[in-house]
A protein has these predicted regions:
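Basic nucleic-acid-binding interfaces
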Residues: 1-24, 31, 35-65
Length: 65
């Protein structure tokens, strides 16, 4: 799996319609107007661990290569 930075992941979420709803410390939470749940992304983070990317993919419905 390719390594992604938090900036890249956030850009993908925003492009898919996710909106920032909350920030607590270094954790940003995003909510989609039609999809269920929230997605939390640690920002800034140069390389998000693969297991975290899998979790973000499952929550958001996005595919990371």
């Amino acid at each position: 799996m390719k390594s992604y930075s938090s900036r890249e992941v956030i850009a993908m979420l925003k492009a898919d319609g996710w909106e920032l709803v909350s920030t607590e410390g270094s954790h940003h939470q995003y909510k989609h107007p039609t999809k269920k749940g929230k997605v939390t992304v640690k920002h800034p983070c140069k390389d998000i661990p693969p297991k975290t990317l899998k979790s973000i993919a499952a929550q958001s419905g996005l595919a990371f290569q």
